[in-house]
Amino acid sequence: MLNSKQRAKLKSVASAENAIFQIGKGGVGEAAVKSIYDALEARELVKISVLDNSDTDPREAAEQIAELTSSEVVTVIGRKIILFKVASKPEKRSVSALI
């Protein structure tokens, strides 16, 4: 569980990053969840954009993805989702070393 200072630090790190995933009309699919999980293992911090044509609510999508990937929702701002998960390999823990 992240505290407010950790969330603030992760938000500041993610603000400079572009969204690397998009959720469209199809919603949150199995392939998307697998790709997001792999990215979380490699990067620890992932920014996702929910497109305007998507019927999926960003908050609900964030909770669903977080549950399926065992990650934590850092924040949902508008249609952007930021997720964090500590990498299982210690050499991949660049972001978690900051918090």
Protein language model regions, located:
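Positively charged, polar, low-complexity stretches
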Residues: 1-99
